[in-house]
UniProtKB/Swiss-Prot annotation:
GO annotation terms (biological process): ribosomal large subunit assembly; translation
Cited PANTHER family: 39S RIBOSOMAL PROTEIN L20
Keywords: Ribonucleoprotein, Ribosomal protein, RNA-binding, rRNA-binding
Record organism: Polaromonas naphthalenivorans (strain CJ2)
Record carries keyword Acyltransferase: no
MF GO annotations: rRNA binding; structural constituent of ribosome
Protein name: Large ribosomal subunit protein bL20
Keyword Signal attached: no
SUPFAM superfamilies linked: Ribosomal protein L20
Family: Belongs to the bacterial ribosomal protein bL20 family.
Cellular component terms (Gene Ontology): ribonucleoprotein complex; ribosome
Pfam families, per the entry: Ribosomal_L20
Function: Binds directly to 23S ribosomal RNA and is necessary for the in vitro assembly process of the 50S ribosomal subunit. It is not involved in the protein synthesizing functions of that subunit.
Length: 119
């Protein structure tokens, strides 16, 4: 069986890992063995936070809608209930954006929700 020289593949693998570790501080960015662990950990953080990002944004949208709807005299839960009864299906992202950039339109939606709560 012929001898296999692995210098080329090892060099490529090291180069790939060190490229992914570019910008890391200290030996995490330039020593292969440590950089490999740092890159793996960074990947775990990235995987976790891609999922957390969705939760964080939803919480932000709800906080913004709550603040805006309170200025019109409704809590978030009352507002959400009114929207459901009124048959208005606008998602939280759009409602949050409307509350910030188009408060008149948001106010009109709040009034519709209020009307359905009373009726």
């Amino acid at each position: 069986m012929p001898r296999v020289k692995r210098g080329v593949t090892a060099r490529a693998r090291h180069k790939k890992v060190l490229a992914l570790a570019k910008g890391f501080r200290g030996r995490r960015g330039n020593v292969f063995r440590i950089a490999k662990e740092a890159v793996m950990k960074a990947g775990q953080y990235a995987y976790r936070d891609r999922r957390n990002k969705k939760r964080v944004f939803r919480r932000l949208w709800i906080a913004r809608i709550n603040a805006a709807s309170r200025s019109f005299g409704l809590t978030y839960s009352q507002f959400a209930n009114g929207l459901k009864k009124a048959g208005i299906e606008i998602d939280r992202k759009v409602l949050s954006d409307m509350a910030i950039h188009d408060s008149a339109a948001f106010g009109a939606i709040v009034e519709q929700a209020k009307a359905k709560l009373v009726a």
